[in-house]
Amino acid sequence: MLYHPNDIPDEAVEALRPAYERSSKLYGTPELWIQRCREGTAQLWRSEDGKYWAVTEVYEGTAYGKLLHGLASSGEFCEELVQEGEAWAKEQGCKAAMTGGRRGWEKLFSTMGYKTVAVMLLKEF
């Protein structure tokens, strides 16, 4: 389910914290993600059973026009929630969806029609 910006529960920050802890930490914090959802610049999703949470954002001006970006997710993966997000994105005029993450996501998302298009590299100073 997609939350309206005014209805985002406080528990969302802690529900998304595991995603942050396992992430590259390049895309902000759970607090920032939820702030953006409350401002309407990102979207918060939760599976019907409450075990899977995700944050998305819509990019404009890409090679695809509008594109849905899966920013973060946490909990027990729910393919139905991903499909719900994709359907919503199509309604918004998005022509594609993308996400990033750890290597295991490649196999999982490839079964849903996603393909690997880039590898991210990081060097700390």
Where are these regions (language model features)?
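Active-site rim helix/loop that mediates acceptor-substrate recognition in acyltransferases
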Residues: 23-42
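Conserved donor-binding loop and adjoining core beta-sheet/short helix segment
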Residues: 38-76, 125
